[in-house]
């Protein structure tokens, strides 16, 4: 029995599982029969190509099935192989999924489905199933460990419709230093969007919307820190960025209504109930929309 067979001899993962099948194909390759020959460069292209073929044309139902397979693979797979290979395999898979969802498709429906399918794991940043905290490389290359998180990528590209969904699920509130996201929105240089060729004016409008959304989530936004960066020679993407940060986030007392929103959202966030838990509250629809960052 070959070493690769010994490593992957038992599994509780069904044969129809995309990731189990992909792993089987990799370890059965003649060139990978001995551990000493295994290397990132040997299997990364095959993993990427296999998943890219699916993700390029997948619809929401197909993406749902793919995420279900990945969750089952991570949770139930009985495969046994070296820790380094396990890390490489899962990171390549996650990098490919995030790359296609955020950098290639840029579809809010796919982003929301990813958040819904993995929300039970989001409180543990180290979990392989907490996909929203994993990093990916926006211009695909086999180096997922040196990438950025989806939230930072969306802030860089100012995709306001996707940014809003991430915030509704409490992703910004979970950030240790949310001011870094604000700084990215204001100061990060314009970059070419992969999927949609929009005018610079549209990017400016999206940046304004992203700033407004941040003000609905945060109680404090350090304008002083932004100005410090400007004094060092950095240039804002919108000249009137100051107009989109309420004075109650950096100078005047914060509104009581906004503090109530933050308190309720924080309680729901603690119980992993954002955003669905908002709509189970017995309050008027307008207040539900306020809590859900619609207004």
From Swiss-Prot:
The keyword Cell division does not apply. Coiled coil: none annotated. Keywords: ANK repeat, Ubl conjugation pathway. Residues 232-295 form the SOCS box domain. It comes from the Eukaryota. It holds the Pfam family SOCS_box. One of its GO terms (cellular component) is cytosol. GO terms for biological process: intracellular signal transduction; protein ubiquitination. Specifically expressed in testis. Not detected in other tissues tested. May be a substrate-recognition component of a SCF-like ECS (Elongin-Cullin-SOCS-box protein) E3 ubiquitin-protein ligase complex which mediates the ubiquitination and subsequent proteasomal degradation of target proteins. PANTHER family: ANKYRIN REPEAT AND SOCS BOX PROTEIN 17. This is Ankyrin repeat and SOCS box protein 17. It comes from Homo sapiens.
